[in-house]
C-alpha cells in the first residue's frame, strides 16, 4: 500500500449557543444587528470555553471564521487556550456567513471587531464587508459558495496544516456536502450541534487508503460537552 500523504486536516466547527438559537424572549424591537448577528448566551460562552479546552493541546495553524459575532466569540475561546505554537488570531472569511443573512446587514467593520477579538481578514481576501448576504438564494447558490470556500482552502493549505473552519448550522451543511461531493437531495439531514466538531482529512491526490483524496474521520462530535451538558451530546 502506498504511503498516505496528509495535506490538510480540517476541523469544521459550529458556533456555540446564541440568543438566536433559544429565542429573543418576545422582543419585537430587535435591531438588524441583534436579529442577524446575535451574541452568545451564558451557556454558549461556557460551551466555547470547553471547546477551547478540547484544542488546548492541538496547535492549530489557522482559524478561519465567519464574521458574525456568535462564531467569532466561539473561536476566540479556542485562541485563548491555544499552546505557544498554536494560532493566535482569527482570520475572517466573510463567505462563511450563515445562510439567509439579509442584504441590509453587512456586519460590523473589521476595526469594530478588532475591539473585541484578535481578528484580521483572511489572507488573499479584499473586502470591506465582513458578512456575505444570501437572503433569497437557494441551496445551489449556497453549495457553490461552499465549493468556492473549499477551493480557497485547498489552494492555500496543502503542507500538513491543521485548521479550524468555524461557521453555522445551515451553512455547515453546504460545506459538508461539498467536501464529500454529495448532492443537495441526500434524503437525510446533516446535524450540527452547537460547538460540534466534524473532522476531514485531505490527502495528496491518490494517496488515500483506497485511492481517495478525502476522509471524514468523525461528524458532530461533542464529547467536550459531555460532562457539563450531557443533554446536547451524542452520549445521551
Model region roles, listed by residue range:
Residues 65-66, 144, 166-167:
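Short beta-strand scaffold positions
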Residues 34, 115-141:
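Short glycine/proline- and acidic residue-enriched helix-loop micro-motifs
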Residues 5-7, 49-126, 208:
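Phosphate-coordination/substrate-recognition cap region in phosphate-metabolizing enzymes
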Residues 10, 161-170:
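Generic beta-sheet signal
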Residues 1-61, 76, 80, 84, ...:
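An N-terminal RHG(E/S)-centered segment typical of histidine phosphatases
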Residues 1-9, 98-119, 159-161, 177-236:
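Acidic, low-complexity terminal tails and accessory targeting/binding regions
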Residues 168-173, 196:
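GST superfamily/GST-like fold recognition
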Residues 57-59, 153-161:
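Glycine-rich phosphate-binding loop signature in dinucleotide/nucleotide-binding domains
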Amino acid at each position: 500500500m502506498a504511503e498516505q500523504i496528509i495535506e490538510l486536516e480540517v476541523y469544521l466547527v459550529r458556533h456555540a449557543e446564541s440568543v438566536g438559537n433559544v429565542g429573543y424572549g418576545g422582543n419585537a424591537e430587535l435591531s438588524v444587528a441583534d436579529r442577524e448577528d446575535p451574541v452568545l448566551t451564558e451557556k454558549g460562552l461556557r460551551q466555547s470555553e470547553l471547546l477551547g479546552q478540547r484544542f488546548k493541546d492541538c496547535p492549530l495553524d489557522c482559524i478561519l471564521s465567519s464574521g458574525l459575532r456568535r462564531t467569532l466569540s466561539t473561536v476566540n475561546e479556542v485562541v485563548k487556550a491555544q499552546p505557544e505554537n498554536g494560532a493566535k488570531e482569527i482570520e475572517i472569511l466573510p463567505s462563511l456567513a450563515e445562510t439567509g443573512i439579509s442584504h441590509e446587514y453587512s456586519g460590523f467593520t473589521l476595526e469594530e471587531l478588532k475591539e473585541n477579538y484578535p481578528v484580521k481578514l483572511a489572507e488573499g481576501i479584499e473586502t470591506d464587508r465582513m458578512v456575505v448576504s444570501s437572503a433569497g438564494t437557494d441551496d445551489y447558490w449556497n453549495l457553490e459558495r461552499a465549493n468556492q470556500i473549499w477551493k480557497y482552502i485547498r489552494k492555500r493549505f496543502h503542507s500538513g496544516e491543521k485548521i479550524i473552519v468555524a461557521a453555522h448550522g445551515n451553512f455547515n451543511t453546504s460545506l459538508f456536502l461539498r467536501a464529500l461531493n454529495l448532492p443537495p437531495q441526500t434524503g437525510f439531514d446533516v446535524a450540527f450541534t452547537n460547538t460540534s466538531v466534524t473532522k476531514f482529512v485531505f490527502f495528496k491526490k491518490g494517496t488515500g487508503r483506497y485511492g481517495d483524496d478525502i476522509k471524514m474521520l468523525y461528524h458532530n462530535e461533542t464529547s467536550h460537552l459531555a460532562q457539563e451538558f450531557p443533554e446536547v451530546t451524542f452520549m445521551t
